[in-house]
Regions:
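Structural preference for beta-strand elements that scaffold enzyme active sites
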Residues: 2, 34-38, 102-107, 206-208, ...
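Short, solvent-exposed turn/loop segments enriched in Gly/Ser/Thr/Pro and often Arg
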Residues: 2-7, 40-49, 104-113, 211-216, ...
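Aromatic-lined substrate-binding rim segments of carbohydrate-active enzymes
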Residues: 2-67, 91-94, 191-201
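Surface-exposed, active-site-proximal loop segments in enzymatic domains
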Residues: 6-21, 49-80, 170-176, 276-279, ...
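Acidic-and-aromatic substrate-binding clefts and catalytic sites of carbohydrate-active enzymes
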Residues: 8-21, 48, 114, 212-219, ...
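Acidic (Asp/Glu)-rich catalytic clusters
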Residues: 27-34, 95-101, 220-225, 253-260
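Polysaccharide-binding and catalytic clefts of secreted carbohydrate-active enzymes
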Residues: 53-55, 60-229, 233-247
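Carbohydrate-binding surfaces of carbohydrate-active enzymes
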Residues: 158-162, 200, 204, 213, ...
Length: 344
């Protein structure tokens, strides 16, 4: 079972004040009942105190608009304040649970880049220039590669270069391509930051993060070998006649990313999602069919989001194994239980 993924504000209610007592009880309870844990590092959603104390840690769009807390992933990919706080939390978690018998695998962050895959703030701009210098070495080479003679965009100093922010008309496509490469590398660097901490403290515990199929902002081919296990979140639309084929392709891609090694289906819904214009329920047997499809394409783990429907929050209407009322007398529960027994 996956736990702790969005628990930062409970694990660290105030800067440097950690409270793991509730997680201790949960880890012990799960182990006592024969359940092993995919433990999230909780870094995907910083608590409000981070932005309150470090407003420059918030991401900025190409239009110059700051994205404020209230959802998730409200952090700049290059914020030193975010990285310092995230590293400290991951270190404390690893030191606390390194010997816990329930710990089976680490789940770093969550769906990197899903909502914020790039940031256009001044800190990110400086990081972009550094990345470009390491890539090209000289301004002459950068000007040649970018074709900056067109529209009189030749650069004479590195400081003149900015991210492809909103401009009067079409941006330079080569600049945009390098920006996307840079942003992907920035996401990977955040993953490396957490992975290095965990491998230092818990070298025998595998590390993973959940990829999202054909997600373009991150170069999964470059990223996958950094993880011990490749994991996938997949949410095909039950109302789409082509969903089964698309899901098959996503599963095949995930297997190839791990060079044929077994991979984890970390997230799928047991019934319906809550974020489409039309949130169609899976038909009877469809959850089993798509789970078996993943297994046939190399997965050795089938998991779900989420265990019990949330009582509040942005995903309170998302499907779950157990509904709000808490009963196990439902078609979804019976189908998931049957699948579990079948896979045993």
């Amino acid at each position: 079972v996956s736990i702790g993924i969005f628990a930062w504000s409970y694990l660290e209610p105030q800067p440097g004040q950690y409270d793991f007592a509730w997680l201790d009880r949960l880890m012990d309870l799960l182990y006592d009942h024969g359940v092993h844990v995919s433990l999230g590092t909780a870094t995907a959603s910083p608590p409000p105190w981070l932005a309150h104390r470090h407003p420059n840690s918030l991401p900025v769009t190409a239009d110059g608009v700051t994205l404020w807390p209230g959802g998730r992933q409200a952090y700049c990919l290059h914020s030193q304040a975010y990285m310092k706080a995230a590293s400290a939390l991951v270190t404390r978690l690893a030191e606390c649970y390194k010997d816990h018998p329930a710990l089976a695998i680490w789940h770093i962050n969550n769906e990197y880049g899903c909502h914020v895959s790039e940031c256009f703030c001044d800190v990110s701009a400086a990081a972009f220039r550094k990345w470009l210098f390491e890539r090209y070495g000289t301004l002459d080479e950068l000007n040649r590669a970018w074709g900056t003679a067109f529209w009189s965009q030749r650069y004479g100093q590195w400081e003149e270069i900015n991210p492809p922010r909103r401009a009067p008309t079409f941006a330079n496509p080569t600049q945009q391509l390098d920006w996307r490469r840079f942003s992907s590398d920035s996401l990977i660097a955040l993953g490396d930051m957490e992975t290095e901490i965990l491998r230092r403290i818990t070298p025998d515990v595998p590390v993973t993060t959940n990829f999202m199929g054909f997600f373009k902002p991150a170069d999964y081919r470059k990223w996958a070998h950094r993880e011990d296990v490749v994991s996938l979140d997949t949410y095909p639309d039950p109302s789409d006649a082509y969903a089964a084929g698309q899901n098959a392709a996503v599963c095949d891609l995930t297997r190839s990313l791990g060079d044929g090694k077994p991979w984890m289906l970390m997230e799928q819904t047991s019934s319906a999602v809550n974020w489409r214009p039309r949130n169609v329920l899976k038909q009877p047997g469809q959850m089993r069919l798509w789970s078996m499809q993943a297994l046939a394409r190399g997965a050795n783990t089938v998991m779900f989001f989420q265990w019990r429907a949330a009582r509040a929050g942005a995903e309170k209407f998302h499907g779950a194994l157990v509904p709000h009322v808490g009963t196990q007398d439902s078609r979804v529960w019976r189908e998931v239980s049957a699948l579990g027994n079948e896979l045993q």
